[in-house]
Amino acid sequence: MDSNTTTSFQVDCYLWYIRKLLSMRNMCDAPFDDRLRRDQKALKGRGSTLGLDLRVATMGGKKIVENILKSEADENLKIAIASSPAPRYITDMSIEEISREWYMLMPRQKITGGLMVKMDQAIMDNIIILKANFSVLFDQLDTLVSLRAFTEAGAIVAEISPIPSMPGHSTEDVKNAIGILIGGLEWNDNSIRASENIQRFAWGIRDEDGGPPLPPKQKRYMARRVEPKV
């Protein structure tokens, strides 16, 4: 195993532990707690893949971080922090919407770029609204937390979510996953509308009618790639 991979995992485990302490002391907000839960799943998946114990990795990460802080001058730390842009957290969905359980009559799923696309293909002739919670860096979607598709009545009919055991995803991965989801839902004559935040930060444009800017041919092509759930 590459030593950098081990070091990265150890530091991630220790930083997650520090964030957990903040949460336990009620020193953080809801988006912080939401990311904390998802990152915990991701670390468990990575630990299983790498064959590393989380507690041992956390202790190793603590030593690494402490050594860095001891050797780093305060002035250098201030400069590094000031020059690093802070991501923003965009929330289309409420805590209830993002955590609600949902079920599929005709399940379909596909993995693409570290993301899981799930949809209920029993849904027909509905107006579907796409909502997402994600972080933004440099005015562009950085990390997707969750994207869900809702009917006008509020029922959840599809979802895109990161796979904890797989590495991160890019903006293009998210756009491709949304294209697959749209294609699958439009195959059954559903009308899709994406939130303004999704359009702005994923595609960098705004569509007045709320429709995502994907050409019909791409939607149909992606729809054919959606495979039955095993």
Swiss-Prot record:
Residues 1-73 are annotated as: RNA-binding and homodimerization. Upon interferon induction, ISGylated via host HERC5; this results in the impairment of NS1 interaction with RNA targets due to its inability to form homodimers and to interact with host EIF2AK2/PKR. It is found in: Host nucleus; Host cytoplasm. It comes from the Viruses. Residues 180-215 are annotated as: CPSF4-binding. It holds the Pfam family Flu_NS1. GO terms for biological process: symbiont-mediated suppression of host cytoplasmic pattern recognition receptor signaling pathway via inhibition of RIG-I activity; symbiont-mediated suppression of host gene expression; symbiont-mediated suppression of host mRNA processing; symbiont-mediated suppression of host PKR/eIFalpha signaling; symbiont-mediated suppression of host type I interferon-mediated signaling pathway. Residues 206-230 are annotated as: Disordered. One of its GO terms (cellular component) is host cell nucleus. Keywords: Eukaryotic host gene expression shutoff by virus, Host cytoplasm, Host gene expression shutoff by virus, Host mRNA suppression by virus, Host nucleus, Host-virus interaction, Inhibition of host innate immune response by virus, Inhibition of host interferon signaling pathway by virus, Inhibition of host PKR by virus, Inhibition of host pre-mRNA processing by virus, Inhibition of host RIG-I by virus, Inhibition of host RLR pathway by virus, Interferon antiviral system evasion, RNA-binding, Ubl conjugation, Viral immunoevasion. Belongs to the influenza A viruses NS1 family. Homodimer. Interacts with host TRIM25 (via coiled coil); this interaction specifically inhibits TRIM25 multimerization and TRIM25-mediated RIGI CARD ubiquitination. Interacts with human EIF2AK2/PKR, CPSF4, IVNS1ABP and PABPN1. The dsRNA-binding region is required for suppression of RNA silencing. Inhibits post-transcriptional processing of cellular pre-mRNA, by binding and inhibiting two cellular proteins that are required for the 3'-end processing of cellular pre-mRNAs: the 30 kDa cleavage and polyadenylation specificity factor/CPSF4 and the poly(A)-binding protein 2/PABPN1. In turn, unprocessed 3' end pre-mRNAs accumulate in the host nucleus and are no longer exported to the cytoplasm. Cellular protein synthesis is thereby shut off very early after virus infection. This is Non-structural protein 1. It comes from Influenza A virus (strain A/Equine/Jillin/1/1989 H3N8). The gene is NS.
